[in-house]
């Protein structure tokens, strides 16, 4: 028995492969063509979110094969499986979006159940769309077996009449079309060229934001999260990940050794520096929750406030993920942040080395303008800002990257679901200067905390992005531009102040000092609360009903179970 098999006595897979009582289990493994040697090697789960719903995940199965080759070459036995994913680009703007955030929990739960049920010793997780990235990382830290995360890669930009375009331009084209600024023929032409390859949305939307997080938090190999999906180098990263996870097993380096409070602060810093998605303020607390670490929206916002915004990435800037990869990738961004004191260098990573050690060989690239030096930023504070006030006692979040005006005051225009707000935008029945309020769209009230990209993109397409504001207890896509505030808590469904608003109430937003208030006294709000009654949803059964019963507030990540702080034994220690 060699060194690879001799460690079996401390690994979970011993429960299904070792001893005479496991002869029935081994017979199943022989049925799949495994050799005796392979059965007694460490079992590595290779999980992907492959499906044919959208280009985001279509390349994942190919990459999984490369991971398996790496695992096998390093003396492990790869065991491939798939889990679900809900692609936001397809779910956006209709009832299907209610499934998006709950799918994050389903992904984490299904990966956990598969690994537990089959006693796998390690995990390489491959994800390609918004909720699958945090869902996979949540599973890794929950299980706490040696793990490496792999992003499936971003899509290449499209080309519309010589202009680089992304799916963001498609959603905004709908707004232009609604006001006669784009013809049917033009709309048809751009929709055929906007998304030319496999991969997730190419700008710094939620998928690329969480991909950036995966490197900064230490769960992904350096440079691996930046390469676009069609690039052949992705297979090399995947093969290396398969090899490296075997080293993690041997060294017994686990996700909770990597994902510490300081690593979470690093993750929040790269979100702010890259002008990333507000959804990170939901996903980072959820990942922390799996580790038993308290790290809520306010903790995230504190890091955002003191981190400079330095990456000129869409939607607030000019470039896409491919451009940043080609000038130095995420390590270039991290290098200048580290050199200027914005990252903790002593955090461990899946390389077995620290952040500082990984960045030691990274040289600054002066021949590019995608990433600025951290001491010469686009703005001195991050591209995402946390807010709090009498309208959001549990906080709210706004993406300010690319915005020039960070204050807004106006009368409320209230809608109790996104469809009604979108119809008002399409018909232009709103007024310039108003604050559009979309409520009962929170985690419990939606249920599912939908994103409002269809509405915000239509407003931008109509040229109103800087002339109105929008607040919601739901979420916004990473592709959203304009003064759009999400995650307002407490949500309307549980009687939060956003549910007490009436048309005409004056709302004051100040993203400079971080406040969100309505010009009502505490007594007026209390009087309205006494008259408020809960609303029923149309979901009285099924997965969304179950989610609504379990989900917690957005400020803590909208999680559905007690978390690592309450567990008595993590899976890796069975």
Q: What spans do the regions from the language model cover?
A:
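Catalytic or ion-coupling anion/metal-binding cores of large enzyme and transporter domains
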Residues: 2-52, 56-58, 63-82, 89-90, ...
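Glycine-rich, N-terminal phosphate-binding loop and its surrounding beta-alpha-beta segment
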Residues: 71, 110-114
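Glycine-rich, highly charged phosphate/nucleotide-binding loops
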Residues: 100-109
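A short, small-residue-rich loop immediately preceding and capping a beta-strand
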Residues: 114-136, 148-151
